Amino acid sequence: MPLENLEEEGLPKNPDLRIAQLRFLLSLPEHRGDAAVREELMAAVRENNMAPYYEALCKSLDWQMDVDLLSKMKKANEEELKRLDEELEDAEKNLGESEIRDAMMAKAEYLCQIGDKEGALTAFRKTYDKTVALGHRLDIVFYLLRIGLFYMDNDLITRNTEKAKSLIEEGGDWDRRNRLKVYQGLYCVAIRDFKQAAELFLDTVSTFTSYELMDYKTFVTYTVYVSMIALERPDLREKVIKGAEILEVLHSLPAVRQYLFSLYECRYSVFFQSLAIVEQEMKKDWLFAPHYRYYVREMRIHAYSQLLESYRSLTLGYMAEAFGVGVDFIDQELSRFIAAGRLHCKIDKVNEIVETNRPDSKNWQYQETIKKGDLLLNRVQKLSRVINM
């Protein structure tokens, strides 16, 4: 398992995705007046002299701008950019291609750090054109991907993901190949492709070094969330429940562990309680928030299906008790999902019984075997007639 002291293996936290998370929190009605979150965000803005970002922030969150602070940060930006331009000019006059590239990279990184998106993109692209080494080119593409994630720029992410894949095919190393999977997985979460996200995250659980995106606990939490909605029960058991790296981290994430194991162990009332906690967490997460309603609905269907698979029929009262909810609630839930074709069962309202009517997989397999057997027999008979002739 990657240890916390391996965090230096990550690329620079530039741009810092934690800032995007804080900005998202402050856009929510329940956190709009949260002084602690606002101060944490503003501390990052002041520390990095993020004048361009601060202007955009005040506009998007409808904040009154601190003109003195903005003026101070702009002055600091101008002075640093002047210094970087002088270093670049000196490198172009007196030094070699490598030093020129380093000076260009330093300017691009600074523009990225202060939140000048367009300036940073232009500077990184110029640096990319000056870069020969494949590894350095990939590092620039990872910068562009982080900028894309920070601003959730879909076009920027998709274009540079393809570019990164192409460069890796040319001979990218093992570390960068695995790093790209984490970036792709994070974007898959953002666009609700949970199945692909689960596949990518599970591939990198034991090799994770992308601390520039998130810490390892957050990564494992995301991995559990997407795996539970995307994987069938046998795969969940092999890849998550029995995953040594995941289990090790889950000891320090009791709520996530309970969420995972309560569903797997069929403790449905505990699972529903855990799902309610997960729902609240997802509402506050900048990547999961647009999808939390979909996610919670699908996980409820998943749990209902898992219970129904074990029975031909059961009472509404038993189901309600199993999930720790009222009979009326379970009746309405099942009726809605049955009408939508998401659950294969029917409700006997008179006797308050739920009867499963899902396709019988064993019966289907038996019929398929008979059908294929008949075809094989016919072919053998035709072949025998040809041989006898």
UniProtKB/Swiss-Prot annotation:
Domain (PCI) ranges: 193-361
One Pfam family matching this protein: PCI
Signal peptide residue numbers: none
Gene, per the UniProt record: Psmd6
UniProt protein name: 26S proteasome non-ATPase regulatory subunit 6
Alphabetical keyword list: Proteasome
Record family assignment: Belongs to the proteasome subunit S10 family.
GO CC annotation: proteasome accessory complex
Highest taxon, organism lineage: Eukaryota
Subunit structure, interactors included: Component of the 19S proteasome regulatory particle complex. The 26S proteasome consists of a 20S core particle (CP) and two 19S regulatory subunits (RP). The regulatory particle is made of a lid composed of 9 subunits including PSMD6, a base containing 6 ATPases and few additional components.
Annotated function: Component of the 26S proteasome, a multiprotein complex involved in the ATP-dependent degradation of ubiquitinated proteins. This complex plays a key role in the maintenance of protein homeostasis by removing misfolded or damaged proteins, which could impair cellular functions, and by removing proteins whose functions are no longer required. Therefore, the proteasome participates in numerous cellular processes, including cell cycle progression, apoptosis, or DNA damage repair.
